[in-house]
Design a protein with these regions (language model features):
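Active-site pocket-lining/capping segments in soluble small-molecule metabolic enzymes
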Residues: 2-155, 159, 164-308
Length: 308
């Protein structure tokens, strides 16, 4: 694709962080061989940097409820084979000291920390968990979770300046705050990981409460039931509606605006949305339009996949 977008530096690469490490394991087992075998189908200015998620029943989980039940060893074998980092989404914001001893989550960390191949990481919210991970599993890199709802730019910059984080995912409402993003030095721009396809109402004031409700559910604790007040909540996630969100970052935005400005990390949400929507995300963000039908056909004809 070099030469088609002269504003983009030749060496610029967009790195995608994709949802469903466990939740969409079967999907990626079909998609990644296609991605490797037919690179001509996909943009040459982007690559898959990581897959993120958690299996169901993870105490430390947050953001969304994990739903995958595949063997973590199979997951790691897949990511190793394709040179992709695996990230555990341990973004529960309500952890207490007694939760740090959870056997299942520690077992996952040991497995991911000891895996050969690309370095694996953890998406984290709790400072308590952060210190535990740094102390016990220093082999894992850390990502600051969007569940912190960093809407204040000064707070975002402070988070970016913390050396313990490889990347920081700000709230999507800062996605187009270029008057402030442009003030960041390149070292900090390299750490900003934009959440591209959020469908949440841009004016929502309950985002933190929504994430806390998920954290309580993962802990098996009672508390206020969060009910989304968005007028579109009943319709669920719609990619077409996400595209109309003021914070949406599409493929053309990445090529023409973010990469030329020195931003290269892009997170795609969708762990709880189903593999049919995941396919639409991958078509939009990774796939050259003439080859959309080729990718669709290859995956539709895979009898092992349940896309709907």
């Amino acid at each position: 694709m070099k030469g088609e977008h002269s504003v983009m530096p030749d060496a610029a690469v967009a790195y995608y962080h994709l949802p469903g490490l466990f939740e969409f394991y079967d999907f990626y087992r079909a998609f990644l061989p296609l991605y490797r075998r037919h690179r001509e189908y996909f943009y040459d200015w982007c690559d898959i940097a990581s897959l993120y998620g958690v299996p169901e029943g993870c105490l430390w989980g947050g953001g969304r409820m994990g739903s995958g039940n595949c063997d973590p060893r199979d997951v790691l074998a897949l990511t190793r084979e394709y040179g992709i980092s695996a990230r555990l989404t341990f973004s529960n914001s309500l952890l207490r000291p007694e939760h740090l001893a959870d056997r299942g989550c520690n077992r996952l960390c040991r497995l991911f920390a000891g895996s050969a191949g690309p370095q694996n990481g953890v998406i984290v919210h709790s400072e308590l968990l952060l210190e535990h991970l740094r102390s016990v599993y220093p082999e894992l890199y850390l990502v600051s979770s969007t569940t912190k709802v960093l809407t204040d730019f000064a707070a975002l910059r402070q988070e970016l300046e913390r050396p313990e984080f490889r990347c920081v995912v700000p709230d999507f409402r800062l996605n187009r705050a270029f008057d402030r993003l442009d003030t960041l030095p390149q070292a900090l721009r390299d750490k900003v990981e934009f959440l591209c396809n959020e469908c949440c109402d841009f004016g929502c004031r309950e985002r933190r409460a929504c994430y806390e409700a998920v954290s309580r559910e993962n802990l098996g604790e009672g508390g206020p039931v969060h009910r989304c007040a968005s007028p579109d909540a009943a319709g669920g996630y719609r990619f077409s509606r996400a595209m109309e969100n003021p914070g949406f970052i599409g493929v053309d935005d990445i090529r023409s605006t973010y990469l030329p400005k020195g931003f290269s990390q892009f997170k795609i949400e969708g762990r709880s949305l189903g593999s049919a929507l995941l396919l639409e995300f991958l078509l939009h963000y990774l796939t050259r339009p003439p080859y959309h039908i080729h990718v669709r056909e290859a995956l539709y004809l895979d009898n092992g996949l349940d896309l709907f």
